[in-house]
Amino acid sequence: WRESMLYELKSGNLRFAAIYGVGENSNNTVTNKDSGFGIEYKNFLMPGFSIVYARNKDHSVTGANNQNYNEKFTLTKDFKLASGNKIKIWYMHEDVGLDSKLFTGSNSDGEVNWYGIRYKTGPMEFQYSYGDSDANEGPTYDRDGYNIGMYYKLSKTSRIYLAHSKSDAGSGDGANLDIESTLIGLRHDF
């Protein structure tokens, strides 16, 4: 999204943003005329409940049956417990057409359902999410996985991070390559 125009509007609990790519010439359509928009409404119908809809379109995608957009819809609910601890739960449905890493086949199209929870208590925050994918090429191209992580605030300027992620690949790529990674980090602000 280099060389693009962005417009954002905030009014109360409503937030709207739109972006339009203008930087490429007609011979290079990497971002020329690509577009995206998003709408967020906080405290929708009840306190702490938010909805988000977003969509972006890539005009450089060509070929029969290749989807040229990503679209997502998210529901989030925030809770504050009597102890002061906070919990956030969310669900996101994503119609994917532009991300080749979510599925194991050559086609980038499919749908993913994400489920997650975040718990915050004092200086610690813990998060877990699970993604269940459905590749358009068939069930052997799905890639389902989970992410788990936490950070602990050691002081005003230091934090420690721990995370683990695992993604189980379908057998459609011929290699059945699963992905797994672990992160340990220390951050200090000067």
Regions inferred by a protein language model and the residue ranges of each:
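A short, acidic, flexible beta-alpha connecting loop/helix-capping segment that sits on the rim
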Residues: 58-61, 96, 164-170, 179
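Outer-envelope exported proteins of Gram-negative bacteria
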Residues: 19, 90, 161-163
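Surface-exposed coil loops of outer-membrane beta-barrel proteins
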Residues: 1-38
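C-terminal closing repeat unit and adjoining cap/tail of repeat-based domains
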Residues: 147-169
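Surface-exposed loop and membrane-interface regions of Gram-negative outer-membrane beta-barrel proteins
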Residues: 23-33, 58-63, 172, 176
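Short loop/turn positions at the edges of beta-strands in beta-sheet-rich folds
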Residues: 1, 43-45, 154
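Detector for outer-membrane/organellar transmembrane beta-barrel domains
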Residues: 36-148
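Outer-membrane beta-barrel "beta-signal"
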Residues: 148, 152, 178-190
